[in-house]
Amino acid sequence: MAGIQQKRKTIKSFKTRRKVVPVLIPKKGQAVISNTGEPASRYIIDYKNTQLLVKFISPQGKILSRRATGLTAKQQRIMANAIKRARMGGLVPFVNYELGSKK
């Protein structure tokens, strides 16, 4: 019995994880945002930063793929969640209607 309690005391408690700020850094310096043609610099991915989010949305309103944006898998997941959160908040439209198309 005494041996079990000694083992429990030596086990470290779980540390709370700090929330990491997602940063958009081009992988290997080759990421190019397809809409602008400019290399992507260092940005903090946030749903309130609509100027950045719009660059990763197609003219039809779809989220661009990793191949088109050059993001890593982790950055793409964070970007998709930020775009979805901005859509629900009304900051970014769900669908972009082009001038010649009908509803």
Curated annotation (Swiss-Prot):
Q: Does the keyword Ribosomal protein apply?
A: yes
What the entry lists under PANTHER family is as follows:
30S RIBOSOMAL PROTEIN S18, SMALL RIBOSOMAL SUBUNIT PROTEIN BS18M
Q: Does the keyword Secreted apply?
A: no
InterPro entries on file: Ribosomal_bS18 (IPR001648), Ribosomal_bS18_CS (IPR018275), Ribosomal_bS18_sf (IPR036870)
Q: Which GO terms describe its cellular component?
A: chloroplast; mitochondrial small ribosomal subunit
| Assembly description | Part of the 30S ribosomal subunit.
The UniProt keywords, alphabetically, are: Chloroplast, Plastid, Ribonucleoprotein, Ribosomal protein, RNA-binding, rRNA-binding
Enumerate the subcellular locations listed in this protein's record, separating them with semicolons. Answer: Plastid, Chloroplast
What this protein is called in its record is Small ribosomal subunit protein bS18c
What family is reported?
Belongs to the bacterial ribosomal protein bS18 family.
